[in-house]
């Protein structure tokens, strides 16, 4: 049995057509149910629906053979025991530093609000910038307005939310899109099946 880990939301919506082109169909009744393990039209493939941040964890520990996750999640989680094999070129956006102005980044110790703690730390360490990272789970754009932080690090798509809150994107950390990842052990034990899936998906990109 091959287990594929997906997360609900944009990734699932944009991945389903690609999977269908590759021969994997999940019935609407399955998708609309409260089940977390979904049957497919293929007897040897099942899909599990989990939180986006948990996809690499399930793949890393072998609870799923294949997963589809955003590059932002993979950067935060690390890549032990998994291969990143394909850029699916969907759910595209950018991980950006945003502030009220570029001058706000000129600080001895920069205060940054973000939920992307590891990516932020790596980026500013590589620049040699001393920083204090404040972990938030939402309403990131509020932090500079109320003096909580000098800037934020967040995903930016159109930039409209930043603009509406008086912020501008000042530095790009990473281009983000959904990636296909594979458990390293599964790649050896289920090599033919997994390679076939990778080739099918790559062909239909």
Swiss-Prot record:
Keywords: Amino-acid biosynthesis, ATP-binding, Cytoplasm, Glycosyltransferase, Histidine biosynthesis, Nucleotide-binding, Transferase
Protein name: ATP phosphoribosyltransferase
GO MF term (any one): ATP phosphoribosyltransferase activity
Catalytic activity, as annotated: 1-(5-phospho-beta-D-ribosyl)-ATP + diphosphate = 5-phospho-alpha-D-ribose 1-diphosphate + ATP
Quaternary structure note: Heteromultimer composed of HisG and HisZ subunits.
Pfam families in the record: HisG
Family: Belongs to the ATP phosphoribosyltransferase family. Short subfamily.
Cellular location(s): Cytoplasm
Role noted for this protein: Catalyzes the condensation of ATP and 5-phosphoribose 1-diphosphate to form N'-(5'-phosphoribosyl)-ATP (PR-ATP). Has a crucial role in the pathway because the rate of histidine biosynthesis seems to be controlled primarily by regulation of HisG enzymatic activity.
Pathway: Amino-acid biosynthesis; L-histidine biosynthesis; L-histidine from 5-phospho-alpha-D-ribose 1-diphosphate: step 1/9
UniProt comment concerning the protein's domains: Lacks the C-terminal regulatory region which is replaced by HisZ.
GO cellular component: cytoplasm
Record GO biological process: L-histidine biosynthetic process
InterPro entries from the UniProt entry: ATP_PRibTrfase_cat, ATP_PRibTrfase_CS, ATP_PRibTrfase_HisG, ATP_PRibTrfase_HisG_short
EC class of the enzyme, as a word: transferase
Gene3D superfamilies: Periplasmic binding protein-like II
SUPFAM superfamilies: Periplasmic binding protein-like II
Keyword Transferase attached: yes
EC number, UniProt record: 2.4.2.17
């Amino acid at each position: 049995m091959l287990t594929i880990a997906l997360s609900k939301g944009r990734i699932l919506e944009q991945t389903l057509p690609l999977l269908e082109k590759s021969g994997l169909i999940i019935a609407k009744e399955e998708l609309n149910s409260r089940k977390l393990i979904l049957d497919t039209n293929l007897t040897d493939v099942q899909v599990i629906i989990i939180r986006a941040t948990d996809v690499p964890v399930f793949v890393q520990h072998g609870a799923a053979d294949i997963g589809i996750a955003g590059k932002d999640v993979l950067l935060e989680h690390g890549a032990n025991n998994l291969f990143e094999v394909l850029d699916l070129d969907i759910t595209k956006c950018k991980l950006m530093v945003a502030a009220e102005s570029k001058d706000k980044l000129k600080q001895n110790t920069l205060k940054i609000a973000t939920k992307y703690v590891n990516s932020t730390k790596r980026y500013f360490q590589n620049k040699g910038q001393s920083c204090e990272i404040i972990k938030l789970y939402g309403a990131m754009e509020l932090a500079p307005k109320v003096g909580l932080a000098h800037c934020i690090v967040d995903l930016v798509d159109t930039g409209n939310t930043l603009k509406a809150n008086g912020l501008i994107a000042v530095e790009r950390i990473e281009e983000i899109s959904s990636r296909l990842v594979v458990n390293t052990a599964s790649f050896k034990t289920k090599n033919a099946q997994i390679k076939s899936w990778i080739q099918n998906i790559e062909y239909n990109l």
